[in-house]
């Protein structure tokens, strides 16, 4: 039996795409996944170019599998994702042992690219943007577990000055409603009970309701439709953009109980001057207005965010405004990074860089503050009963189970493994730095 090894870098969109690569090659090549690259017949790296370190790590990992190609000339090594889109032929020039290079929109062509590589003996590169063609060429999803991702749109048309996504994934393209609903229904039929809708700007979905054109639906309508699918008990989405938060989305939080009380809403900075330089399209006041409306609809809403510190020209005053916003909003988790210029983006040409030591100092302060807020929120949950989906065995102790609450907290507890994939009610007994402890109250069958 031939085997496939996939190494995934970056965001949840990449995790979803990696699953699709496995589906495509499983259907066409009868490949089964392995966690050991040493025994693989095909090795794929699904890459991320959002951060500089992630990009360099790809080439480091490619170097680590080079010897496998030398011992097994039939081994196929491929590079996909955003680094592939950005670098293209340059990947083969830097690592000639790479057989195929493909972008996020051409992963469905993997079988053809591999076949052509074997036939011609030449490395194959396809980093075009054929919009949603890839979704028309996917076999039915194969899943394990009670949670799954579903991509509802691809690309980004916001062109923030620091970001490479529009250049590596293309502009925004929404999937038709019937396609999305068919995929979710298929997952529900396999036992999935929680679905996360994915997109670079997921709430910008404005796709056609049907393939014959005409009527358009907005993101709130899509949420309503997905929530009605039998078997789906919990609904998440990521990543959202503050500019796309409409009153209808606020209303969805008030009237769709299946929509979880957690939202990832990237703000990037608390300074209007820096937000304008980033071309984010909103002010701090407008962002706080979005938060107020969300919490008016769902008072217990938990918010996580993205922050970039050390953007060109950022001052101590700008950074303190970010810290003030963190205190005012009460974020309880974040993906925060020091700014690193990405080739080809407008921000990479900006002068007045912030010293690295200043960036690191700011980052440490920001992360510490959010960790403190997260711990306070977790501590307030102690004694409460939380409904949680049991995801699997605990990473900390394989004799225990791990479940996830609606506000995205992991709870470790003692329970029967047969509960995996079910919802349980848990009394929260302790708040640890990165997880909760709980005791089971009731179970669902």
UniProtKB/Swiss-Prot annotation:
<keyword id="KW-0004">4Fe-4S</keyword>
<keyword id="KW-0479">Metal-binding</keyword>
<feature type="binding site">
    <location>
        <position position="82"/>
    </location>
    <ligand>
        <name>[4Fe-4S] cluster 1</name>
    </ligand>
</feature>
<dbReference type="InterPro" id="IPR002792">
    <property type="entry name" value="TRAM_dom"/>
</dbReference>
<dbReference type="InterPro" id="IPR020612">
    <property type="entry name" value="Methylthiotransferase_CS"/>
</dbReference>
<keyword id="KW-0949">S-adenosyl-L-methionine</keyword>
<dbReference type="InterPro" id="IPR038135">
    <property type="entry name" value="Methylthiotransferase_N_sf"/>
</dbReference>
<dbReference type="GO" id="GO:0005829">
    <property type="term" value="C:cytosol"/>
</dbReference>
<keyword id="KW-0808">Transferase</keyword>
<feature type="domain" description="TRAM">
    <location>
        <begin position="379"/>
        <end position="442"/>
    </location>
</feature>
<dbReference type="InterPro" id="IPR006638">
    <property type="entry name" value="Elp3/MiaA/NifB-like_rSAM"/>
</dbReference>
<dbReference type="Pfam" id="PF00919">
    <property type="entry name" value="UPF0004"/>
</dbReference>
<feature type="binding site">
    <location>
        <position position="160"/>
    </location>
    <ligand>
        <name>[4Fe-4S] cluster 2</name>
    </ligand>
</feature>
<dbReference type="GO" id="GO:0035597">
    <property type="term" value="F:N6-isopentenyladenosine methylthiotransferase activity"/>
</dbReference>
<dbReference type="InterPro" id="IPR007197">
    <property type="entry name" value="rSAM"/>
</dbReference>
<dbReference type="InterPro" id="IPR005839">
    <property type="entry name" value="Methylthiotransferase"/>
</dbReference>
<comment type="function">
    <text>Catalyzes the methylthiolation of N6-(dimethylallyl)adenosine (i(6)A), leading to the formation of 2-methylthio-N6-(dimethylallyl)adenosine (ms(2)i(6)A) at position 37 in tRNAs that read codons beginning with uridine.</text>
</comment>
<dbReference type="Pfam" id="PF04055">
    <property type="entry name" value="Radical_SAM"/>
</dbReference>
<feature type="binding site">
    <location>
        <position position="156"/>
    </location>
    <ligand>
        <name>[4Fe-4S] cluster 2</name>
    </ligand>
</feature>
<feature type="binding site">
    <location>
        <position position="48"/>
    </location>
    <ligand>
        <name>[4Fe-4S] cluster 1</name>
    </ligand>
</feature>
<keyword id="KW-0819">tRNA processing</keyword>
<dbReference type="GO" id="GO:0051539">
    <property type="term" value="F:4 iron, 4 sulfur cluster binding"/>
</dbReference>
<dbReference type="InterPro" id="IPR023404">
    <property type="entry name" value="rSAM_horseshoe"/>
</dbReference>
<feature type="binding site">
    <location>
        <position position="11"/>
    </location>
    <ligand>
        <name>[4Fe-4S] cluster 1</name>
    </ligand>
</feature>
<dbReference type="GO" id="GO:0046872">
    <property type="term" value="F:metal ion binding"/>
</dbReference>
<comment type="subunit">
    <text>Monomer.</text>
</comment>
<comment type="similarity">
    <text>Belongs to the methylthiotransferase family. MiaB subfamily.</text>
</comment>
<keyword id="KW-0411">Iron-sulfur</keyword>
<feature type="domain" description="Radical SAM core">
    <location>
        <begin position="142"/>
        <end position="378"/>
    </location>
</feature>
<feature type="binding site">
    <location>
        <position position="163"/>
    </location>
    <ligand>
        <name>[4Fe-4S] cluster 2</name>
    </ligand>
</feature>
<keyword id="KW-0963">Cytoplasm</keyword>
<feature type="domain" description="MTTase N-terminal">
    <location>
        <begin position="2"/>
        <end position="119"/>
    </location>
</feature>
<protein>
    <recommendedName>
        <fullName>tRNA-2-methylthio-N(6)-dimethylallyladenosine synthase</fullName>
        <ecNumber>2.8.4.3</ecNumber>
    </recommendedName>
</protein>
<dbReference type="InterPro" id="IPR013848">
    <property type="entry name" value="Methylthiotransferase_N"/>
</dbReference>
<dbReference type="Pfam" id="PF01938">
    <property type="entry name" value="TRAM"/>
</dbReference>
<keyword id="KW-0408">Iron</keyword>
<dbReference type="InterPro" id="IPR006463">
    <property type="entry name" value="MiaB_methiolase"/>
</dbReference>
């Amino acid at each position: 039996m031939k085997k496939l090894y996939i190494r995934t870098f970056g965001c949840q969109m990449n995790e979803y795409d990696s699953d699709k690569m496995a589906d495509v090659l499983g259907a066409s090549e009868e490949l089964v996944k392995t966690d050991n690259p040493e025994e693989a017949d095909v090795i794929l790296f699904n890459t991320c170019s959002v951060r500089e370190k992630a990009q360099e790590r790809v080439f480091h990992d490619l170097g680590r599998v080079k010897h496998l190609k030398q011992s097994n000339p039939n081994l196929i090594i491929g590079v996909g994702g955003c680094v592939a889109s950005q670098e293209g032929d340059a990947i083969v020039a830097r690592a000639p042992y790479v057989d195929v290079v493909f972008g996020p929109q051409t992963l469905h062509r993997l079988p053809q690219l591999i076949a052509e590589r074997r036939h011609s003996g030449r490395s194959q590169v396809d980093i075009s943007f054929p919009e949603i063609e890839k979704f028309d060429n996917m076999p039915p999803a194969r899943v394990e577990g009670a949670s799954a991702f579903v991509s509802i749109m691809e690309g980004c048309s916001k062109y923030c000055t620091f970001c490479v996504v529009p250049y590596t994934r293309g502009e925004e393209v929404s999937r038709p409603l019937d396609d999305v609903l068919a995929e979710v229904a298929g997952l529900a039929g396999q036992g999935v009970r929680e679905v996360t809708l994915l997109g670079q700007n997921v709430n910008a979905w404005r796709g056609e309701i049907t393939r014959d054109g005409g009527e358009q639906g907005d993101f709130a309508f899509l949420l309503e439709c997905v929530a009605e699918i039998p078997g789906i008990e919990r609904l998440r989405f990521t990543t959202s953009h503050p500019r796309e938060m409409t009153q209808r989305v606020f209303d969805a939080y008030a009237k769709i109980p299946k929509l979880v009380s957690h939202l990832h809403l990237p703000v990037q900075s608390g300074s209007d001057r820096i937000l304008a330089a980033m071309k984010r399209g909103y002010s701090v006041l407008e962002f706080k207005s979005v938060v107020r409306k969300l919490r008016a609809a769902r008072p217990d809403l938990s918010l996580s965010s993205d922050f970039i510190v050390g953007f060109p020209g950022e001052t101590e005053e700008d950074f303190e405004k970010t810290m003030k916003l963190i205190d005012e909003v009460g974020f309880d988790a974040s993906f925060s990074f020091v700014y690193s210029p990405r080739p080809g983006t407008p921000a990479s040409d900006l002068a007045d860089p912030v010293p690295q030591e200043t960036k690191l100092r700011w980052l440490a302060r920001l992360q510490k503050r959010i960790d403190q807020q997260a711990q306070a929120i977790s501590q307030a949950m102690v004694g409460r009963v939380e409904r949680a989906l049991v995801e699997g065995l605990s990473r900390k102790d394989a004799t225990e189970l791990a479940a996830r609450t609606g506000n995205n907290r992991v709870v470790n507890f003692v329970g029967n493994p047969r509960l995996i994939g079910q919802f349980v009610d848990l009394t929260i007994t302790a708040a640890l730095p990165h997880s909760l402890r709980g005791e089971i109250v009731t179970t669902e069958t």
